[in-house]
């Protein structure tokens, strides 16, 4: 594009592992996620009590990491390689975000199967925006992003096709 303010960019990549229970299983998942991403892991907590799954409100049931900048770009390249650079059109939302899953953590380089730990899957969410989005998030003189500048599903799909050579089905 000719206008640099219209070029989409990856704002952040959020990697989430939903374990569904606290305890040693969650600690193992945190260790795996920290090894794969190289960053400190944050726990995610249950929003409500679910007796069918024996989950209480406020109980830690998952872990996540937010990656930005070069770390996000590198991790995204690796993750897209694992899913064979194929995404479904339904994985893109109207705001320009993309979510996809990796079924086994052992697909990442340097990770091997450990029978004591098992296999964990993870959800990867990519937030795509344009330069100038800070206007809507800053504390002072906050403004809305005009509709013409907002990123759409089609913009994100073309961005992923051009930059990452992703096949969208």
From Swiss-Prot:
Gene Ontology molecular function: any one: rRNA binding
GO biological process: translation
Function: This is one of the proteins that bind and probably mediate the attachment of the 5S RNA into the large ribosomal subunit, where it forms part of the central protuberance. In the 70S ribosome it contacts protein S13 of the 30S subunit (bridge B1b), connecting the 2 subunits; this bridge is implicated in subunit movement. May contact the P site tRNA; the 5S rRNA and some of its associated proteins might help stabilize positioning of ribosome-bound tRNAs.
Gene3D superfamilies: 3.30.1440.10
PANTHER family the record matches: 60S RIBOSOMAL PROTEIN L11-RELATED (PTHR11994)
Annotated protein name in UniProt: Large ribosomal subunit protein uL5
Domain of life, source organism: Archaea
Family: Belongs to the universal ribosomal protein uL5 family.
Classification via InterPro entries: Ribosomal_uL5, Ribosomal_uL5_arc, Ribosomal_uL5_C, Ribosomal_uL5_CS, Ribosomal_uL5_dom_sf, Ribosomal_uL5_N
GO cellular component: ribonucleoprotein complex; ribosome
RNA-binding keyword on record: yes
Keyword Nuclease: no
Assembly and oligomerization: Part of the 50S ribosomal subunit; contacts the 5S rRNA and probably tRNA. Forms a bridge to the 30S subunit in the 70S ribosome.
Disulfide bond entries: none
Protein keywords: Ribonucleoprotein, Ribosomal protein, RNA-binding, rRNA-binding, tRNA-binding
Pfam families: Ribosomal_L5 (PF00281), Ribosomal_L5_C (PF00673)
